[in-house]
Amino acid sequence: LAEVVKRSAGFSRRSLVDKLGIKPGSRISFSNAPRYYSSLLGLPPGELEIVGDRSRDLDFLHLFVRNRKRLVEAFPKAKRRIKSNGTLWVSWPTLTSTLAGDLSENVVREIGLANGLVDVKVAAVDEDWSGLKFVYRLKDRS
């Protein structure tokens, strides 16, 4: 029972698909996601096109990183994979997670801004991962 309380404490009852803004018919991909990510999302079968790690023209990409060095390397590549009206979520381990490294919300935001995207939302993915939603600025969308 204590484990159940720990996992649900402080987390929204909304589904992760809703929190992340994944829409039916979207072309989506995940990079370095935890093994349990698909079950955490609770994706409705057949409503999304889930594509591989190198696909482009994505409506939604969720990048999981554990340290600053990896994020600095991965962010520009991830940005190129999304459509100009697409969404890039970047997740990093929470400070209380056993996975925690040298990332924080401010560091992730700083790297995103330096790469020309803006953050528009923050969300708890689960007890181990936080996330920031990045999009292209309105003037940069086609």
What are these regions (language model features)?
Residues 1-43:
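N-terminal, charge-rich interaction modules
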Residues 47-58:
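Short acidic low-complexity segments
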Residues 61-71:
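Short, glycine-rich nucleotide/cofactor-binding loops
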Residues 72-84:
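A short glycine-rich, Lys/Arg-flanked "PGG" loop and its adjoining helix->strand segment in the class I
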Residues 84-94:
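Conserved beta-strand signature within the Rossmann-like core of class I S-adenosyl-L-methionine
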Residues 96-109:
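Conserved class I S-adenosyl-L-methionine
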Residues 115-142:
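Class I S-adenosyl-L-methionine
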